[in-house]
């Protein structure tokens, strides 16, 4: 656990994934409440172990090594309870290819057992603040299915503005943006 990138976000921390998180990530992404909105995250445990080991952990190291000029790199952080270090969700940033530039997005999910406690809002605000303060990012995006009411509320609480609709994989999504200069006013 030493030397892991960590952001203090109030009651929760955002921190780099570790191998020990694989079972928690697998359990989280196996919840129907999660894969309904993030089907690409559904996997076998073996796939998840491969992804965490060979992609997500190395991608995070590469992202952090290139701050402030992060380019098209991804960072995937676990949401953990500050008091117990229990892994309860994730909050990520990367490029959303379906959007025209600037197309850096934030994406997140939290276990059904920890919803409606403000943890996701704390995580998104923490990641947004980090990106705007420490990287060359000037605008962030999020795409959300209209029926994902909780996620739409999180984005509104974090200052994102609904800017339009976009079709992704034959489904209508709301497109939200947050511009650094507007947030810093």
Q: What are the residue ranges of the model-derived segments?
A:
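Conserved GNAT acetyl-CoA-binding A-motif
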Residues: 134-143
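Conserved G/P- and acidic residue-centered "switch" motifs that form tight phosphate/ATP-binding loops
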Residues: 85, 118, 148
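Conserved beta-strand-loop-alpha-helix junction that forms the acyl-donor binding cleft
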Residues: 70-72, 142-152
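Proline- and acidic/polar-enriched loop/turn elements at helix boundaries
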Residues: 41, 126, 143-144, 167
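Conserved acetyl-CoA-binding loop-helix of GNAT-fold acetyltransferases
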Residues: 108, 116-130, 152-157
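Conserved phosphate-binding and hydrolysis motifs of nucleotide-dependent enzymes
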Residues: 89, 148, 157-159
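GNAT-family acyltransferases
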Residues: 1-113, 134, 161-163, 168-185
């Amino acid at each position: 656990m030493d030397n892991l990138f960590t952001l203090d976000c109030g009651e929760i921390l955002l921190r780099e994934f570790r191998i020990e998180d694989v079972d928690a990530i697998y359990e989280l992404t196996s919840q129907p409440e999660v894969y309904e909105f993030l089907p690409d995250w559904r996997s076998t445990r073996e796939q998840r172990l491969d992804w965490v080991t060979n992609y997500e952990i190395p991608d995070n190291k590469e992202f952090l090594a290139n701050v402030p000029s992060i380019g098209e790199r991804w960072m995937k952080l676990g949401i953990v309870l500050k008091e117990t270090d229990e892994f309860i969700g994730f909050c990520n940033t990367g490029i959303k290819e379906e959007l025209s530039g600037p197309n850096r997005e934030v994406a997140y999910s939290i276990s059904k057992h920890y919803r409606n406690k403000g943890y996701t809002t704390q995580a998104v605000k923490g990641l947004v603040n980090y990106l705007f303060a420490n990287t060359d990012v000037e605008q962030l995006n999020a795409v959300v299915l209209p029926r994902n009411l909780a996620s739409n509320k999180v984005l509104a609480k974090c200052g994102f503005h609904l800017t339009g609709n976009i079709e992704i994989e034959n489904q209508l999504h709301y497109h939200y943006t947050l511009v650094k200069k507007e947030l810093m006013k």
